[in-house]
């Protein structure tokens, strides 16, 4: 068996990626989220496949087909809620994974990090299009509002929006193409995740200290396979509790009303995992400025390696940077809260302050603090 594992062309790839892979001996549970994201993606693809067998991407029947899945298909309700809440678990793992990368300086692996940013955009696009498919009120109006943002692009904006819509409004053509893209994108995400791993295995994993661990490596199996299985069990437990006890906790009640172009919901808002970006978008009174801020709120991650001024890689031994990191986390939670609130005083000014702080922290305050820490250590 050992010889086959190391000799067979396919097994050799699996062996060098998941079995005999040299891994640092001191990586903490924060390094579990990569494998958890893989599990989330598999869950989403499988549940999505079974949902697609019963779903119809037509404006007349989309909403009733989702109802049919929940009422008439064997365990259809379970598959539907696993898929909907699986997306939430996916984003929780994503945010923690990115946060880990920021804290421990994993962004210094430039190729891996940039593929990761690309993956984040791809997953966000997939989730947005998936939210449109049930064709409820929030699906329809969310699609209308977000696609309409592209009209802010000078010269080609309005033509681009109509091209994406496939007409003069969000209608049957839009729903059909969103379903097609929502089906294909997870496979693109899976391919990108493979490239992400490929680049990671070129350098080996980072570790909490941010120091080279070449002198102290252990095989991935059995140490980290067992550790990852624990993470998977906890993820599955959390997802199962969410699905079986409060499946609609993270959803919007408006989406249980069929889409009606003549009736606008009082508060149009996306799913909870987009609220921070939505708050940044709304905090700028200008349409084009808001769109740019929205894109930059994620794209800024690609510039993080260029803004690294510290002579230490990780924040493990940098208390000032640690404080700023947790302020950033609190700021993102504030933005998430603001994104779900109506556009009125005092939420407007809180959102604007939180948005300014978000960009200031990442672009100015953290790099300057890193330089200060270098000086304090007389480096």
UniProtKB/Swiss-Prot annotation:
Transmembrane segments annotated in the record for this chain: 33-53, 77-98, 113-133, 178-198, 226-246, 288-308, 320-340, 347-367
Required cofactor names: heme b
Topology in the lipid bilayer: Multi-pass membrane protein
Assigned keywords, A-Z: Electron transport, Heme, Iron, Membrane, Metal-binding, Mitochondrion, Mitochondrion inner membrane, Respiratory chain, Transmembrane, Transmembrane helix, Transport, Ubiquinone
Residues where a ubiquinone binds: 201
PROSITE patterns: CYTB_CTER, CYTB_NTER
CDD domains in the cross-refs: cytochrome_b_C, Cytochrome_b_N
MF (Gene Ontology): metal ion binding; ubiquinol-cytochrome-c reductase activity
GO BP, sorted A to Z: mitochondrial electron transport, ubiquinol to cytochrome c
Note on how the cofactor is bound: Binds 2 heme b groups non-covalently.
Annotated heme b b566 binding sites: 97, 196
Compartments, record wording: Mitochondrion inner membrane
Signal peptide (residue range): none
Self-association state and partner proteins as the record states: The cytochrome bc1 complex contains 11 subunits: 3 respiratory subunits (MT-CYB, CYC1 and UQCRFS1), 2 core proteins (UQCRC1 and UQCRC2) and 6 low-molecular weight proteins (UQCRH/QCR6, UQCRB/QCR7, UQCRQ/QCR8, UQCR10/QCR9, UQCR11/QCR10 and a cleavage product of UQCRFS1). This cytochrome bc1 complex then forms a dimer.
Entry's family note: Belongs to the cytochrome b family.
UniProt miscellaneous comment: Heme 1 (or BL or b562) is low-potential and absorbs at about 562 nm, and heme 2 (or BH or b566) is high-potential and absorbs at about 566 nm.
Name of the protein in question: Cytochrome b
Organism field: Cryptotis goldmani (Goldman's small-eared shrew)
Gene label: MT-CYB
